[in-house]
């Protein structure tokens, strides 16, 4: 008989929390009891889990003593306060915030790339889910690096407002609507107007001119894939509700051509490749909403530098970029460690 587990989803009313519940139901995760948890502000609300309706539990009074796995999807401040309480009750935590990603005692996992490091989870009973851009990047870059070592990567990201939570989506919607009725709607969540606009500003600016988002992406790539290649990142917020896109320029240590890259990625887990066989042979963010794969298109040789390839990555940032990746981690846990 299949063992079943008690699961808690913290931040269940948020974008990633709701998607986590959806994916747990879709993939028939073996669940005994499941708890939807949020702040007191969400008490009285309900969320869906497959065909079931779950009532929100208060995080401030929740007891983790009988929870096997908790998915934390509610922001770094919540993780900082409540994850120690969960792990003290021997609950395994999969944290989707940035809080533990730099901790050397906490594995940072993309299942298609570095599952071997998952065994280190029991040092703190915490597993970190990577940044929503890092996950699709690693899914695409790791199989290439396994074949021919990467020397340098230049990354430009185009990140949807859902990466900033429901408040980000609301601001894009409200500003767009306001423009059509000639009503002023000043930025609240974002530093500048997001409707009909974009800006290279995600996170705070560091003294070196890079943003915290750009620094996180570079660091997490090196933690997962190693420090043998250099990375340069520019992160851009775009007026799209769901779906991230990434323009990537990859310099390799040896000779490689676009056809080689396409063949390698066609055999890789979690990737759908699109051949350059017509003028619409690329995937845009709106086309990946609700999809689990990482889509790679516009694979081509860099005409300015040898051994270098350009490609375009798109991914649903709420699914593979966040919720799906964490559920895949949990599946590996129950299959091999619990």
From Swiss-Prot:
Keywords: Amino-acid biosynthesis, Diaminopimelate biosynthesis, Lysine biosynthesis, Methionine biosynthesis, NADP, Oxidoreductase, Threonine biosynthesis. It catalyses: L-aspartate 4-semialdehyde + phosphate + NADP(+) = 4-phospho-L-aspartate + NADPH + H(+). SMART domains: Semialdhyde_dh. Pathway: Amino-acid biosynthesis; L-lysine biosynthesis via DAP pathway; (S)-tetrahydrodipicolinate from L-aspartate: step 2/4; Amino-acid biosynthesis; L-methionine biosynthesis via de novo pathway; L-homoserine from L-aspartate: step 2/3; Amino-acid biosynthesis; L-threonine biosynthesis; L-threonine from L-aspartate: step 2/5. GO terms for molecular function: aspartate-semialdehyde dehydrogenase activity; NAD binding; NADP binding; protein dimerization activity. Phosphate binds at residues 101, 216. The keyword Oxidoreductase applies. NCBIfam families: asd_B, PRK14874.1. Catalyzes the NADPH-dependent formation of L-aspartate-semialdehyde (L-ASA) by the reductive dephosphorylation of L-aspartyl-4-phosphate. This is Aspartate-semialdehyde dehydrogenase. It comes from Rickettsia typhi (strain ATCC VR-144 / Wilmington). The gene is asd.
